[in-house]
């Protein structure tokens, strides 16, 4: 059964809705240009309110490894999702700091997936849609056919435009380790719809 991550959490209320729905992980976005950005103190408060067993993931874009590890320590993160142009060295340094690493890859064409080979120290790879100038939050799926050779891989998380209506199809097509959604589960940027979150998790785990 695919793991489910609900990203872009900005409040205790939304975090508890996600956890109650059965999400395996929640994501906190620390990228300053994101409408879903959350401050470190708020993320720490939310993290402390979550029940045990729910993974805490911090989303960073081109943040120095030392700062990633500092924030992770304060918030209590289990994973850093590196969603920018970080190279293998940055991944290695974060991993050596004792934090799990999810390296995001923006899928533009089949060649995008060859990037996986550059990051042997990443724990997981999150496949997201490519859009010029955007680091996540595109709200659109990538071409799943491009990733069919990765079907069943134990280190792939599918993201990008997943909804309660299409997440089951993505899982059946790619059989990933996990799925991730953010903007498609919102009433407004940074505010989750409890109904959409519950439907998404239910569909993913059906």
From Swiss-Prot:
GO terms for molecular function: phosphoribosylanthranilate isomerase activity. GO terms for biological process: L-tryptophan biosynthetic process. InterPro entries: Aldolase_TIM, PRAI_dom, RibuloseP-bd_barrel, TrpF_fam. Transmembrane segments: none annotated. It catalyses: N-(5-phospho-beta-D-ribosyl)anthranilate = 1-(2-carboxyphenylamino)-1-deoxy-D-ribulose 5-phosphate. It holds the Pfam family PRAI. Its EC number is 5.3.1.24. It is an enzyme of class 5 (isomerase). Pathway: Amino-acid biosynthesis; L-tryptophan biosynthesis; L-tryptophan from chorismate: step 3/5. Keywords: Amino-acid biosynthesis, Aromatic amino acid biosynthesis, Isomerase, Tryptophan biosynthesis. It comes from the Bacteria. Belongs to the TrpF family. This is N-(5'-phosphoribosyl)anthranilate isomerase.
